A protein has these predicted regions:
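Solvent-exposed soluble domains appended to multi-pass membrane proteins
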Residues: 1-328
Length: 328
């Protein structure tokens, strides 16, 4: 599972953490990286892979200006950005949003048309399960029904959508299983859904007001998978990892070239495997508030300095730190 900065929304900040390795916990409270801070070129996974000859493409079947993506994506290293205008207007939709299956059909079409042997980094943000979940769709069959009065229609609707996502994901994995070109797929959730408190209390078995910090953090965790159609160094020690480490973990497990910043993040993860705006978890599994002064404070402060250089110090961004030329 990966730990995110918030629950119920804010997809772009999850994108930012994965793509840059930076943490939203270092931004002002309720800050948004895409709309407030990415005003110039910022190093990212896209820019690193671009240095190594990859074409870089972002794809999100929604309006291009959502979360300022049409401005941000070029600044963080993407050559091109496909939005909802690239989709078949008559394509499958649930609740007005393009289905995951329709989204993945577009990805398959892109891969079928790309130049053979030319490496491609494609960053896709799906839209099917976008909130809210109050209104039913007569064209969508809700197959999940939890037999408990606290399991509301919205919860059942959301879980039915996730079930549909599972089916679509299986299909695209099967597609890449049959491709000769080495391919890596990283899939992770952007945030937990915004559902009624009564449903979450059903899951916890207690009032949300009585949750410990450790229990609260469960509302900020989502599943992830790193898969490849060839043998990779699969790890079993990734039960708890925050999104800012996820791209570095992917580079490590697949033996792709890393920057010194990636190496710093992987070393930091050994001490602080997960952190977000609520706090962090140390190597022994103990939860801490960000305001605590302890043996991890110096490391977290160093991390904040490096993030400042990446995001804020546009005239002095360290090419040695964020470039792959000096990495492994």
């Amino acid at each position: 599972y990966t730990t995110l900065f918030r629950s119920g929304g804010g997809t772009s900040n999850s994108e930012y953490e994965f793509l840059t390795g930076n943490s939203v916990s270092s931004l002002p409270l309720n800050g948004n990286a895409y709309t407030q801070f990415v005003k110039h070129k910022v190093p990212s996974l896209a820019s690193q892979l671009k240095q190594q000859g990859y074409d870089t493409l972002a794809f999100h079947p929604y309006k291009a200006h959502g979360w300022n993506r049409d401005t941000v994506y070029p600044l963080i290293g993407f050559d091109n950005f496909l939005d909802e205008t690239s989709m078949n207007p008559n394509g499958e939709k649930f609740r007005g949003w393009y289905s995951d299956a329709e989204d993945y059909n577009k990805i398959i079409d892109i891969f079928n048309k790309k130049k053979a042997g030319q490496p491609l980094f494609l960053f896709n943000v799906t839209i099917q399960n976008h909130g809210g979940y109050l209104i039913a769709d007569k064209n969508f069959k809700e197959e999940i029904k939890i037999k408990d009065e606290k399991a509301t229609d919205t919860a059942n609707r959301y879980l039915s959508l996730i079930h549909e996502s599972d089916r679509a994901f299986e299909k695209i994995i099967n597609y890449f299983k049959n491709q000769k070109e080495p391919t890596i797929v990283v899939m992770f959730g952007d945030h937990q859904p915004k559902l009624e408190d009564s449903f979450y209390e059903l899951l916890y078995g207690k009032s949300l007001n009585s949750l410990s910090l450790k229990e609260l953090q469960k509302k900020y965790t989502v599943p992830f998978i790193i898969w490849a159609n060839y043998d990779i160094d699969a790890k079993s020690d990734v039960e708890n990892v925050s999104a800012n480490y996820l791209s570095s973990l992917m580079l490590q497990q697949t033996n792709l070239k890393m920057s010194r910043y990636n190496e710093f993040l992987l070393n930091m993860r050994n001490e602080v495997p997960a952190l977000n705006a609520n706090g962090y978890v140390d190597k022994d599994g103990k939860n801490h508030e960000l305001s605590e002064n302890n043996e991890y404070t110096k490391l977290i402060t160093q991390y904040q300095y490096l993030q400042y250089n990446s995001l804020m110090d546009k005239k002095h961004v360290s090419t040695d730190l964020f470039s792959v030329k000096d990495g492994k």
